[in-house]
């Protein structure tokens, strides 16, 4: 079944480029940039990839991202991810990147963007993988900081297809960012946002009604609110669900408890994605395979999930 799932044409709509930084590349970049790491070797680092919640993961994620310093680093990161896409027949990807993760430590916005954009361009030309980049605001920072990031992005308007919202969800509701999303949409950006991963269904309502998003990233807690479910089904609002991430971060205790197939059968436009694959134990095919192994996902369900991902593209 793995090989069949791997060959299935699919799109990835929820992927953080910084979260695809495999330990081997992390160590190579640290050596290239002469950065001392708190881990002795790759295996020690992999052993640290055990998380009880989103915040524990984010603490390690931001620590790992510190090795990314130059255009070449960001190119290598993105190119390595695109090669994974090619190997798994991901024909289209819409990755997030978090400029504030890098600008806050003194890396110029254009350094980050140039490296990523060149790799995506090469991916289109050399690998045949279409793509669109999503600029994501960090919700644990202030809305003023998000405005500054948008200011930095506007000269490179054509490099992005959308703005997003990610990082620590609890205590940072979507309404905190209503003004910057209003401004981004007025500049022509489409909006997406993480909501309903650890946060309650109310956060999904806010993302839809205040941020006016076109796609919900995660959204698994929508199933707790029947009125919300009806709206998502009726309006066919896509959900970019990340099964391995959800179990690794204890949103669900075990994959057998995941609700993605229940949502699929109710008519929700759910998609399968890897989120931060270097940290969560698998790329898109591994996520599909986990659904087959633990939830008994059928070939028909896999085809529908893959088609949903292609239908839910922003471009």
Swiss-Prot record:
Protein name: Adenine deaminase
Binding note for cofactor: Binds 1 zinc ion per subunit.
Role of this protein: Catalyzes the hydrolytic deamination of adenine to hypoxanthine. Plays an important role in the purine salvage pathway and in nitrogen catabolism.
Active site: 197
Family: Belongs to the metallo-dependent hydrolases superfamily. Adenosine and AMP deaminases family. Adenine deaminase type 2 subfamily.
Residue numbers binding Zn(2+): 14, 16, 194, 275
Annotated site residue numbers, Important for catalytic activity: 218
GO CC list: cytosol
Source species taxonomy: Bacteria, Pseudomonadati, Pseudomonadota, Gammaproteobacteria, Pseudomonadales
Leading EC class: hydrolase
């Amino acid at each position: 079944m793995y090989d069949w799932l791997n060959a299935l044409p699919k799109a990835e709509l929820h992927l953080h480029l910084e979260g695809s930084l495999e330990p081997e590349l992390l160590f190579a970049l640290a050596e290239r940039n002469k950065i001392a790491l708190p881990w002795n070797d790759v295996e020690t680092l992999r052993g640290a990839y055990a998380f009880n919640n989103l915040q524990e993961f984010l603490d390690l994620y931001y620590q790992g991202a510190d090795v990314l310093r130059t255009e070449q680093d960001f190119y290598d990161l993105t190119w390595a991810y695109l090669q994974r896409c090619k190997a798994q027949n991901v024909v289209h990807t819409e990755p997030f990147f978090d400029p504030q993760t890098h600008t806050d430590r003194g890396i110029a916005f254009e350094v980050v963007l140039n490296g990523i954009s060149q790799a995506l361009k090469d991916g289109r030309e050399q690998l045949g993988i279409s793509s669109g980049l999503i600029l994501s605001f960090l919700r644990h920072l202030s809305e003023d900081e998000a405005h500054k990031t948008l200011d930095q992005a506007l000269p490179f308007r054509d490099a992005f297809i959308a703005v997003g919202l990610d990082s620590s969800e609890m205590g940072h509701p979507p309404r905190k960012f209503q003004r910057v999303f209003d401004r981004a949409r007025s500049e022509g950006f489409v909006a997406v946002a993480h909501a309903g991963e650890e946060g309650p269904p109310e956060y999904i309502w806010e993302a839809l009604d205040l941020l006016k998003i076109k796609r919900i990233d995660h959204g698994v807690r929508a199933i707790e609110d029947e009125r919300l479910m009806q709206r998502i089904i009726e309006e066919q609002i896509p959900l970019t669900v990340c099964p391995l991430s959800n179990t690794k971060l204890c949103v669900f205790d075990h994959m057998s408890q995941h609700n993605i197939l229940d949502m699929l059968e109710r008519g929700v436009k759910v998609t399968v994605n890897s989120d931060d694959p270097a940290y969560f134990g698998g790329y898109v095919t591994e996520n599909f395979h986990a659904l087959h192994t633990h939830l008994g996902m059928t070939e028909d369900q896999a085809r529908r999930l893959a088609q949903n991902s292609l239908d839910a593209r922003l471009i």
